Design a protein with these regions (language model features):
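Short, surface-exposed beta-strand/loop "edge" segments at domain boundaries and coil↔beta transitions
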Residues: 148-150, 228-232, 259-262
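ABC transporter nucleotide-binding domain
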Residues: 165-256
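Short, flexible helix/strand-to-coil boundary loops that buttress conserved ligand/catalytic motifs
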Residues: 69, 215-218, 235, 265, ...
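Short loop/turn segments at beta->alpha junctions
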Residues: 89, 210, 276-279
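Short phosphate-engaging motifs
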Residues: 16, 67, 189, 230, ...
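ABC transporter nucleotide-binding domains
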Residues: 2-4, 9-201, 207
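A structural detector for beta-sheet-dominated domains
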Residues: 5, 25, 224-226, 255, ...
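C-terminal coupling/interaction segments
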Residues: 253-300
Length: 300
């Protein structure tokens, strides 16, 4: 289990992470979303023990991460641009990983090699971006980590390889209880992969919820009133994230219980009333608007 307790990180005069508390349970796949510059990568590096938090602590299975080799030996961090030694081949990097990670499995390395179909003797600097990303997964999973932290891990991969890697991650979670933390701007990928989601903005954590709960708690309402004066009265009754008019129909994005929302609209006897589900991408956009992020260009 990963426990993030009131963690803050400051670079010069900029607060990259501000007092974040978060618990990620063993065997979960946690998706970290956020606006550009929200502090996602800083938080991931702090969880991985690369950065020392200026305040708060990161605890994994009851032990601190920073400057704790035993705990770090069970964590693998995959940055958005994987780093390999100059002129190194996949096999040479495997030798290095074997010397660093005590749980390295040569058997697992061999198994995964059959999936990725990369030549282990080939130099990594001669591979395409997508092939280097495959190599990064190959090496990371061969370390048999308890915690895998990934920053934009599927970027550059073709659809077939994306599906393969998702299946391997699901297998690791199901069979070994792997805990995975994924930061990505591809919300459809997060929606497919994750069972829990956090949304960051300007260094703060806005949302920390199970994905199913988040989707069931936010609704798109299309409504046409017989009397337009009713529109204003709803603001005091419901938590409205967004409202716009499309001809005679009004569109609302509302947080809360579905039946309570429907009842609040039915009071005014609308002649059109539909409650529709939202995708994670839509929820993200409207939550960002609620946090003051300018989404006007998106909605045009």
């Amino acid at each position: 289990m990963i426990e993030i307790r009131e963690v803050s990180k400051v670079f010069q005069d900029r607060k990259a992470v501000q007092g974040i508390s978060l618990t990620i349970h063993k065997g979960n796949i946690f998706g970290l979303l956020g606006s550009n510059g929200a502090g996602k990568t800083t938080l991931l590096k702090t969880v991985a023990g690369i950065y020392l938090p200026d305040a708060g602590s990161v605890i994994i299975d009851g032990k601190p991460v920073f400057e704790n080799p035993d705990t770090k030996g069970r964590i693998v961090f995959m940055p958005d641009f994987p780093y390999f030694f100059p002129q190194a081949s996949i096999m040479q990097m495997a030798d290095f990983y074997r010397s660093v990670y005590p749980r390295w499995s040569g058997e697992r390395f061999k198994e995964l090699g059959g999936l990725f179909s990369l030549d282990p003797k080939r130099k990594l600097n001669r591979l395409s971006k997508g092939m280097r990303q495959q190599a990064a997964f190959w090496l990371a999973l061969s370390c048999m980590p308890d915690v895998l932290i990934m920053d934009e891990p599927l970027d550059g991969l073709d659809p077939v390889m994306r599906r393969l890697i998702k299946n391997v991650l699901f297998q690791e979670v199901a069979e070994r209880g792997l805990t995975a933390v994924i930061s990505s701007h591809n919300l459809r990928e997060i929606e497919d992969l994750c069972d829990h989601v956090g949304i960051m903005h300007e260094g703060a954590l806005l949302i920390d919820k199970e994905l199913d709960e988040l989707k069931s708690d936010t609704h798109k309402v299309q409504v046409a009133f017989r009397d337009e004066r009713h529109e204003g009265a709803l603001s005091g009754k419901l938590q409205i994230l967004h409202r716009e008019r499309r001809g005679s129909v009004c569109l609302y994005i509302v947080k809360g219980d579905r039946e309570r929302i429907a009842d609040a609209f039915r009071v005014y006897n609308p002649y059109v009333l539909d409650l529709l589900p939202l995708t994670l991408e839509e929820i993200f956009i409207y939550e960002m608007e609620g946090a003051g992020y300018d989404i006007a260009p998106i909605l045009l």
